[in-house]
Each structure stands twice: as structure tokens, then as C-alpha cells.
Amino acid sequence: MTTTSGQAPVRRLRRTERREQILDAATHAFARSGYAATSLDDVAREASLTRALLYRHFDSKADLYRAVLDRACQRLVETVGEDDFDETSIPSLLRAAAADPDAFRLLFHHTAREPEFRELIDSITTASAEIARRNLAKRVPAGPWLEWASQLIPTLTIEAVIAWLDSGQPDPDQAAARVDQVVKGVIAAAQPASGSG
């Protein structure tokens, strides 16, 4: 169907579709320049919308950024889970990162640098360390090395995934096994030294 001007009519998106379009555009814009350097005009341009239309969905840039981060967290939990670590966790984390690299980088790279949103990444870091501690307690004796490994493994895993993304996602079939080798290296390093009591 065409209009009298010969152009196809513009299909109006439902509110939920429009919101997703805005969140997708905002994710790309914020990942490209960071929160502080990205304006709502940048997001509107990325989404091919007016700034006024953005304000129909979000009250402010901070509100939009929070919605982007919340959606990234929700998708991550849907893919990876939130309460356990098992043999599917690293492959799931890589799948989540590959599915939306910009959202993954925003969540774990940019957000840590944004004081206004720092509490979100801090809560993820705390929860990840607790999950690691629970799982490592089966293999590493209680004490400072358990605490060290509990903090290091989630951080190292996330940084390994970001480095994998930044390297062009090489060898996706073996990436999880490679990250797992790094995790196992930390676990081995956290074990008591031979001959120590």
C-alpha cells in the first residue's frame, strides 16, 4: 500500500515496541560514548525519533539509562541464571555477551565509571562474589584465599568475556573452555601450598 505521494505509509509502533526501539538505540549510543557524553538528542538520532517522543517514554536521561541497565540485567539473568554456578554458567555468560555486546559492556564496563549508577554494578559484584564463595567453599578451605578467589573469579570472568568481545569473539566454540581454564587456575592458586598445615 502506498500513499498519494508514492511513499509507503509509516507504521506506528505499539508503545512496547517503541520502548524497545528506544532502549536498543540508547544501548548503542551509551555504549559508544558513555553516559555523560551521550545526550538525549544522540539517542533520538540513533532511534530516528524526536526528543519529544523520547520524553513520552522516559522522564530523563537518567531514567532512560536506568531502563537500559535494568533490561541488560534482566536479559543476563534470563540467560545465565542468578543463584548458582555450574558447567553451563560460562557458556551462558558468553552467549549473553555475544547476543548483546553493547549491553554487556555497558553493564560491566561503563556503569562502574558512573557514580550515579555505581550501586547497580556493586550489587552485581557482591552477589557474584557470594555465589563464587558458596561454590568455592566445596573446594577451597575457609580463609583469606577463599575470599581472594571469591572476589577474583567473577571479576576475571567478566573481564575475560569483555576481552573476548573486544577481540572479535574468536573461536566461539572453545571460548568457554578457555575462560574455564582461567577460572580453574585461580582455584588451583587458592589451594593450600603443599606441606602447609
Place the predicted regions along the sequence by residue.
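Secondary-structure edge/capping motif, primarily at the C-terminal ends of alpha-helices
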Residues: V80-D83, L107-T111, W164-G168
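Short helix-capping/turn signature of helix-turn-helix
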Residues: F58, H109-E114
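Amphipathic alpha-helical packing segments from all-alpha helical-bundle domains
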Residues: P115-V140, P144-T155, Q174-A177, Q181-A188
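Short hydrophobic/aromatic patch on the recognition helix
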Residues: A47-F58
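Basic, helix-initiating cap at the start of DNA-binding domains
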Residues: M1-S33, T38-S48, A62-R66
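Alpha-helical DNA-contacting segments of helix-turn-helix folds
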Residues: F58, D63-A72, L120-I124, S128
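Amphipathic alpha-helical linker/stalk segments
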Residues: R32, R66-S92, A132, A137
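Helical hydrophobic small-molecule/effector-binding pocket
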Residues: F85-F108, F117-E119, S123-R133, P154
